[in-house]
C-alpha cells in the first residue's frame, strides 16, 4: 500500500501471481465476445522495433488530456490491452477491445463523446510505476458522438516517447542554508548484495539515500541513532530523496532530534519486496540485516547497536518494518510502523482468508468485498482492483505483489496465486503457506517463547480508524494477540484518520513523524531529554 501520495494501491500502500493470457481474457471478457477493434500504429519516429504491453484507455468526455488510470473509481475509465513483440515502426496492431478489457469490453460502452489514448509499456512496469521514461504514447484523441461498432475502426499512432523529467527535490520553502545542507548531507548508497545476486544469477542491488543530520561533519567523534525507513507501494528511489529533504529541514529547524536516516528503496517490477525472505523475490531480509546494514555501519558513524537501530514505514513499508522487527528482534530497537498492510490474515483488508470456502470477491451473502473507501463510501471492490491489474500487466500490481512476497513458487517458476482471479476463490493450500511464513500475528503467537524477551516493548503501530484500505481491522487483531501474551506493545488508533492524512497534526501534514522521531531518540539516548526548539504537537 502507498505512502503520502494517493496514487496506486497502496496504493496500497499497499501490493503477484501469474495468470495466463487466456485466464486474463476469461476473467474480464464479455460472455459473448464482440469483435470491436482499435488500430494502433507505431510512429515512424521510432528507430528500432519495440516490445511490451500495449494499453488502450478510453474515458467519457471532450477534454483532450492524458487518460490516467487510478484505483479510485477504477471503472470510470475503460481499458484494453495486448502484448506485442518486435513491433516495427510504421506497422499497425489491432487491439480486440472485448478480449482483455476492464471493466468490460468496449462494445458495451454507450454512445457518446470519448477521449482515447494508447500507451506502450516497454518495460512491463506500468502496474507499479505508471508511465515511465521510454514508454511510447499517442496523443489523446477525441471521438465525437462515437458508437461502438459503427463507422470506421478508430485509429491511433504512437508518436511520443516519454522523456525523463528532472524535478527539484528541495522544497522551495527551505532556506538557502537548508538546501545546501540537505544537498551535502544526502548520500547515495548502492550496495551489491552477494545473497540476492546468487539467488537471481545477476547483480542485485540494495539502494537507499542516506541522510546525515545537520552538524554531522562538525562533530567527527559523534555517533548517531539510525532510522531505517522504507516507502509504501508505488514509492521508489526518487521519492525517497524528497523525503530526505523534508527530514533534513525538520532536523535543521529543531523539530526532530539529530539522527541518521537510511531511506530504503523496496520497489521492483514485481511490486514491493518488503525486505522479507521469499522463495520468489529472494532473501531481502537476510541481505539487509547481514550485508547492507554492516556495510552502512562501516561507512558512517552510526550507533551500530540494537538500541540505536530503528524502523519506520507506512503502508507496505509499515508491513515491511513490522516484519523486520518481529523477524530480527535482536537487531532492531523498535519499529514505528504506520498503517501497515495486513498483519493478521484473518482480516486481509476485511476478508478472512482462513474461513471455509473463502472468496476475496464476495462475502457469504454475495456482497462484494470493498478494498478502497473514502469518507465511508466504497470507491473500489477487491474484484475491480484485481481485474484492473490483470489487464494492465502480469507484474507489479498491488494484488500480485502480495503473491510475489507471500506465496510458494509454482511449477512454472512463478508464485502460486492466493486466489483464482476469475472466481475469487481462495486456495487453502496457498493460504496455509502464507500463514506459516508471513502471518505476523500467527508467527508472534507461535514464536513468543523464543522471541518475546527481545521483542517486548519494541512494536509501535499507528493506524486510522477510517483507513482507506481497511487496514485498521488487522491491526486490532494483532493488538489482541500481543495483549493475550501480556506484551508491552503500543497500538494507537487515530479517530477518523485515513491512509493519507494519518501523519497530520493540526496544519502539519507530517507532524506525527516528529513525535515518532522524538520517541526513537529517547530510546537511544534515555538521558539526553531532547526537546524540540519548535513545539512537537502531542498525539491526538
Residue ranges of predicted features:
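N-terminal secretory signal peptides that target proteins for export/translocation
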Residues: 1-9
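Bacterial N-terminal signal peptides
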Residues: 10-23
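Boundary at the C-terminal end of the N-terminal hydrophobic targeting segment
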Residues: 25-29
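Contiguous beta-strand segments within globular domains
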Residues: 31-42, 47-55, 207-209, 228
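Non-catalytic cap/lid and distal C-terminal segments of serine-dependent acyl enzymes
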Residues: 59-540
Amino acid at each position: 500500500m502507498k505512502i503520502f501520495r494517493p496514487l496506486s494501491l497502496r496504493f496500497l500502500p499497499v501490493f503477484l501471481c501469474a495468470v495466463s493470457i487466456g485466464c486474463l481474457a476469461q476473467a474480464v471478457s464479455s460472455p459473448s465476445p464482440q469483435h470491436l477493434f482499435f488500430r494502433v500504429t507505431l510512429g515512424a519516429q521510432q528507430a528500432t522495433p519495440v516490445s511490451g504491453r500495449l494499453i488502450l484507455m478510453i474515458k467519457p468526455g471532450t477534454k483532450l488530456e492524458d487518460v490516467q488510470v487510478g484505483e479510485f473509481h477504477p471503472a470510470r475509465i475503460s481499458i484494453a490491452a495486448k502484448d506485442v513483440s518486435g513491433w516495427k515502426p510504421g506497422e499497425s496492431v489491432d487491439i480486440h477491445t472485448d478480449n482483455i478489457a476492464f471493466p468490460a469490453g468496449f462494445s458495451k460502452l454507450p454512445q457518446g463523446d470519448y477521449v482515447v489514448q494508447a500507451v506502450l509499456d516497454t518495460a512491463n512496469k506500468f502496474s507499479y510505476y505508471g508511465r515511465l521514461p521510454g514508454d511510447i504514447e499517442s496523443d489523446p484523441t477525441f471521438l465525437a458522438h462515437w458508437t461502438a461498432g459503427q463507422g470506421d475502426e478508430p485509429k491511433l499512432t504512437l508518436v511520443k516517447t516519454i522523456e525523463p523529467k528532472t524535478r527539484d527535490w528541495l522544497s522551495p520553502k527551505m532556506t538557502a542554508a537548508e538546501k545546501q545542507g540537505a544537498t551535502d548531507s544526502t548520500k547515495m548508497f548502492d550496495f551489491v548484495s552477494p545473497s540476492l545476486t546468487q539467488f537471481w544469477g545477476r547483480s542485485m542491488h540494495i539502494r537507499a539515500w542516506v541522510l546525515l543530520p545537520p552538524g554531522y561533519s562538525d562533530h567527527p567523534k559523534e555517533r548517531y541513532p539510525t532510522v531505517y525507513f522504507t516507502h509504501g507501494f508505488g514509492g521508489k528511489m526518487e521519492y525517497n530523496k524528497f523525503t530526505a529533504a523534508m527530514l533534513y529541514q525538520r532536523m535543521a529547524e529543531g523539530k526532530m532530534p539529530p539522527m541518521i536516516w537510511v531511506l530504503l528503496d523496496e520497489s521492483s517490477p514485481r511490486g514491493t519486496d518488503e525486505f522479507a525472505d521469499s522463495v520468489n523475490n529472494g532473501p531481502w531480509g537476510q541481505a539487509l540485516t547481514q550485508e547492507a546494514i554492516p556495510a552502512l555501519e562501516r561507512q558512517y558513524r552510526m550507533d551500530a547497536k540494537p538500541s540505536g537501530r530503528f524502523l519506520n514505514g507506512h503502508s507496505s513499508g509499515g508491513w515491511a518494518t513490522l516484519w523486520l522487527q518481529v523477524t530480527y528482534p535482536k537487531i532492531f530497537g523498535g519499529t514505528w510502523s504506520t498503517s501497515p498492510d495486513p498483519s493478521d490474515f484473518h482480516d486481509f483488508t476485511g476478508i478472512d482468508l482462513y474461513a471455509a470456502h473463502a472468496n476475496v470477491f464476495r462475502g457469504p451473502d454475495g456482497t462484494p468485498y470493498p478494498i478502497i473507501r473514502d469518507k465511508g463510501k466504497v470507491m473500489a471492490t477487491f474484484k475491480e482492483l484485481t481485474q484492473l491489474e490483470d489487464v494492465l500487466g502480469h507484474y507489479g500490481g498491488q494484488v500480485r505483489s502480495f503473491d510475489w512476497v507471500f506465496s510458494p513458487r509454482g511449477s512454472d517458476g512463478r508464485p502460486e496465486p492466493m486466489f483464482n482471479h476469475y472466481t475469487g476463490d481462495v486456495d487453502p493450500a496457498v493460504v496455509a503457506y502464507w500463514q506459516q511464513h508471513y502471518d505476523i500475528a500467527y508467527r508472534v503467537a507461535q514464536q513468543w517463547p523464543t522471541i518475546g524477551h527481545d521483542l517486548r516493548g519494541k512494536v509501535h503501530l499507528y493506524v486510522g480508524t477510517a483507513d482507506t484500505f481497511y487496514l485498521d481491522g488487522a491491526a486490532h487483531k494483532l493488538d489482541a494477540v500481543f495483549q493475550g501474551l501480556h506484551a508491552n506493545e503500543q497500538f494507537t488508533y487515530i479517530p477518523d484518520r485515513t491512509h493519507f492524512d494519518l501523519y497530520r497534526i493540526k496544519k502539519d501534514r507530517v507532524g506525527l513523524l516528529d513525535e515518532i522521531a522524538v520517541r526513537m531518540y529517547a530510546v537511544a539516548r534515555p538521558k539526553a531529554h531532547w526537546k524540540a526548539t519548535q513545539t512537537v504537537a502531542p498525539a491526538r
